[in-house]
Regions:
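Class I S-adenosyl-L-methionine-dependent methyltransferase catalytic core
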Residues: 1-217
Length: 217
């Protein structure tokens, strides 16, 4: 079987290293209700996507330690696909963390999309592989919800990093990362220090407070 370009690039990046905790936010493809691949809005040039088969073919199992944790972001409409990816990567689903997107006043941010309901949440699936793969002691009291404001399209909250690093052991790998992060190996076409969003979506709060301070300095 010929590996897709993303799988080849990932294998080259990992180069035999092993990680005990992996965080992934794949660029999922969506199908609309007619079964066709739903394109991004024409006014928003965001990012390319990968097919389900391409995501499943990434050799994540070879990058994971014998005992490891996986945190996998998945849209509400693609939960079955997320579970299939988790299994293809060699992990068993155990639990999840819900991200509730809120407004500045703390209420639910109703600008999400959805055919059946207006989505104000995303799900971070948690899976394990190997023996004795329970979370670290802080995980035993960590609630499985994050309530934060959304940033630019698809970007996940920075609050996930201290949560993950307190509940799971290193070394840490982030796949499809945006920007650099101390203490993490990062892979993806936006994984560099100069990353900043190239579209105006939610521009009024697309930066973290720290980034806003730097931008205004």
């Amino acid at each position: 079987m010929t590996l897709a370009p993303a799988a080849v690039d990932f294998s080259s990046f990992v180069a035999g290293r092993k990680f005990k905790t992996i965080l992934a936010d794949p660029p999922w493809q969506f199908q609309n209700r007619t079964g066709k691949i739903a394109p991004e809005h024409k006014r928003l040039n965001r990012y390319g996507t990968l097919s389900l088969d391409d995501i499943k073919s990434l050799p994540v199992a070879s990058a994971a330690d014998d005992t490891a944790h996986l945190y996998l972001w998945v849209p509400n409409a693609l939960l079955p696909e997320g579970l299939a990816v988790m299994a293809a990567w060699g992990f068993k689903y155990k639990s999840n963390i819900v991200w509730q997107k809120i407004r500045k006043d703390g209420g639910p941010d109703g600008r999400g999309v959805g055919f059946y309901f207006r989505n104000v949440t995303e799900v971070l699936l948690f899976g394990t592989r190997g023996k004795n793969a329970r979370t670290l002691q802080p995980g035993r009291t960590q609630v499985n919800i994050m309530c934060t404001r959304k940033r630019e399209h698809s970007r996940k909250p920075d609050e996930q990093y201290p949560l993950i690093s307190s509940c799971s052991p290193g070394p840490f790998l982030e796949m499809f990362a945006r920007g650099k992060r101390d203490g993490w190996a990062i892979w993806g076409n936006q994984a560099d220090e100069s990353y900043s969003p190239s579209w105006a979506t939610y521009s009024n709060h697309s930066q973290s407070p720290a980034e806003l301070q730097l931008a205004l300095a």
